[in-house]
């Protein structure tokens, strides 16, 4: 069941708040059809104020139950006297301007003298309890048309809205908030959202009692009840007519931006927060030095193949992948030559073993394979002791030559190992003497230690900067554990 505590008098209270006080107290004469409708719900006079007319129309809608039970602001009056008066099959009480126009079409203005006598009559009527009309009431001399009345009311309402707009510009934010609350409380769009029953005594209530009952809910009940339903029943057009709220979203780029109510300028510490550079240390083998303020364009090296400017740390060109010139020491070529010479010496030593003769000549394969079948048996018999003697003499010479050759090979191997050690030491000393690969100015004296190993490729200052920025080792990409200052003698 829908809420039966309803009354269109809320429409009257809310709608009449839009009308100036002078127009609310002005008496108007309803046309016969509208007068018939008003008298059907207890009206007894011929002239009424706008408050009384709106109240009686609300009573009529409530008595006939012309409103929709689900959407109570919609009124269906197609087959009713109200539809004949307004000339529409249905309407919504949220369209208050349309309702004013339909009511004004059925009203006739009353002159000032006529309105003054009628007002005094309406005030005396509740006290005396008589329904007699004033016999001295003079007929109206000039009756302006309904169109003139509508234009006059609209002009006055526009003037009032302009004056209210000018007053709102001078108000403080707190007063504006309170006025906004008051305007929402008396919004005409909330007319039939919650219709309340104002007349418990039936249809015999007088005009003065009806006006008092109209003012009572508008100032007491609506302030408490409308705030709960203002979000559902609020009309955008009516709200925009009463007030407008404009604001700008504050941002960091705003000139008047402040971190507190008093406001203060940004300090150097605040600036440092925005200068933090985040380095992504993923699985990539290269590191970016574009955001490093310590490395300038003067530290970059130019590729000899494609003339591309590259950061100081990578050893290869990022465009053509060419090795940087003078990146590795020149001893690498000498090592290759020494290795080739060592291989040749070993091959020659293997070829000379077992082929030495007493006279120092080398036997060829053809000499060793000469046949002895041509000699006679006698010659063989004579030569056998000589060959034995020669064998006796040749054995010590062969063994001595083998020992000599082995000693020479051992000496050569020792010399080669010494030369290799010297070359390694010289290359190590050269690498240590070379400048830092990052700053290209200081010597390599900062060893980057990770676990049980370390890499010596930068100076101590640059290595400390890498450690402070939580960057990995540029060579092996392992996390840096500590930096050791290295000295060379």
Swiss-Prot record:
- Give the E.C. number(s): 2.3.2.27
Q: Which InterPro entries match?
A: Mdm2, MDM2_mRING-HC-C2H2C4, p53_neg-reg_MDM_2/4, SWIB_MDM2_dom_sf, SWIB_MDM2_domain, Znf_RanBP2, Znf_RanBP2_sf, Znf_RING
Q: Which UniProt keywords apply?
A: Apoptosis, Cytoplasm, Metal-binding, Nucleus, Phosphoprotein, Proto-oncogene, Transferase, Ubl conjugation, Ubl conjugation pathway, Zinc, Zinc-finger
Q: Where in the cell is it found?
A: Nucleus, Nucleoplasm; Cytoplasm; Nucleus, Nucleolus; Nucleus
Q: Which parts of the sequence are annotated with region: Interaction with PYHIN1 and necessary for interaction with RFFL and RNF34?
A: 147-228
- Where is the region Necessary for interaction with USP2? 1-110, 274-489
- Function as written in the Swiss-Prot or TrEMBL entry: E3 ubiquitin-protein ligase that mediates ubiquitination of p53/TP53, leading to its degradation by the proteasome. Inhibits p53/TP53- and p73/TP73-mediated cell cycle arrest and apoptosis by binding its transcriptional activation domain. Also acts as a ubiquitin ligase E3 toward itself, ARRB1 and ARBB2. Permits the nuclear export of p53/TP53. Promotes proteasome-dependent ubiquitin-independent degradation of retinoblastoma RB1 protein. Inhibits DAXX-mediated apoptosis by inducing its ubiquitination and degradation.
Which family is this sequence assigned to? Belongs to the MDM2/MDM4 family.
Question: What's this protein's name?
Answer: E3 ubiquitin-protein ligase Mdm2
Organism per entry: Mus musculus (Mouse)
Q: Which gene underlies this protein?
A: Mdm2
């Amino acid at each position: 069941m829908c809420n039966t505590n309803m009354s269109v008098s809320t429409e009257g209270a809310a709608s009449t708040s839009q009308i100036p006080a002078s127009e609310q107290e002005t008496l108007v004469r309803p046309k016969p059809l509208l007068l018939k409708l008003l008298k059907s719900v207890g009206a007894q006079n011929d002239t009424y104020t706008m408050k009384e007319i709106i109240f009686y129309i609300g009573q009529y809608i409530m008595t006939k139950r012309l409103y929709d039970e689900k959407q109570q602001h919609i009124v269906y009056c197609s087959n009713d006297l109200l539809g004949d008066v307004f000339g529409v099959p249905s309407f919504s009480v949220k369209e208050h301007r349309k309702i004013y126009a339909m009511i004004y079409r059925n009203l006739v203005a009353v002159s000032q003298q006529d309105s003054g006598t009628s007002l005094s009559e309406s005030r005396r009527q509740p006290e005396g309890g008589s329904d007699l009309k004033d016999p001295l009431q003079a007929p109206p001399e000039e009756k302006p048309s309904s169109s003139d009345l509508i234009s006059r009311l609209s002009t006055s309402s526009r003037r009032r809205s302009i004056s209210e707009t000018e007053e709102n510009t001078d108000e403080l934010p707190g007063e504006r908030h309170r006025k906004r609350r008051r305007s929402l409380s008396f919004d005409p769009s909330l007319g039939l959202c919650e219709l309340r029953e104002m007349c418990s005594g039936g249809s015999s209530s007088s005009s003065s009692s009806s006006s008092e009952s109209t003012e009572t809910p508008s100032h007491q009940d609506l302030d408490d009840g409308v705030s709960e339903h203002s979000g559902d029943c609020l009309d955008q057009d009516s709200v925009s007519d009463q007030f407008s709220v404009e604001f700008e979203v504050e941002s960091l780029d705003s000139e008047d931006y402040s971190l507190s109510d008093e406001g203060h300028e940004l300090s150097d510490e605040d600036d440092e927060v925005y200068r933090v550079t985040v380095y992504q240390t993923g699985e990539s083998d290269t590191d970016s030095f574009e955001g490093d303020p310590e490395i300038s364009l003067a530290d970059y090296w130019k590729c000899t193949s494609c003339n591309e400017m590259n950061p100081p740390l990578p050893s290869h060109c990022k465009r053509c992948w060419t090795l940087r010139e003078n990146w590795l020491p020149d001893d690498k070529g000498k090592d290759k030559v020494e290795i080739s010479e060592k291989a040749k010496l070993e091959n020659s030593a293997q070829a000379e073993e077992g082929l030495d003769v007493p006279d120092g000549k080398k036997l060829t394969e053809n000499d060793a394979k000469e046949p002895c079948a041509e000699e006679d048996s006698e010659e063989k018999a004579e030569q056998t002791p000589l060959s034995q003697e020669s064998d006796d003499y040749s054995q010590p010479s062969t063994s001595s030559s083998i020992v000599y050759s082995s000693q020479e090979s051992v000496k050569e191997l020792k010399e080669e190992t010494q030369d290799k050690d010297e070359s390694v030491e010289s290359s190590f000393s050269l690498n240590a003497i070379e400048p830092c690969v990052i700053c290209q100015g200081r010597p390599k004296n900062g060893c980057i230690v990770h676990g049980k190993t370390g890499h010596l490729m930068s100076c101590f200052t640059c290595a400390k900067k890498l450690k402070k920025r939580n960057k990995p080792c540029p060579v092996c990409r392992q996390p840096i554990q500590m930096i050791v200052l290295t000295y060379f003698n």
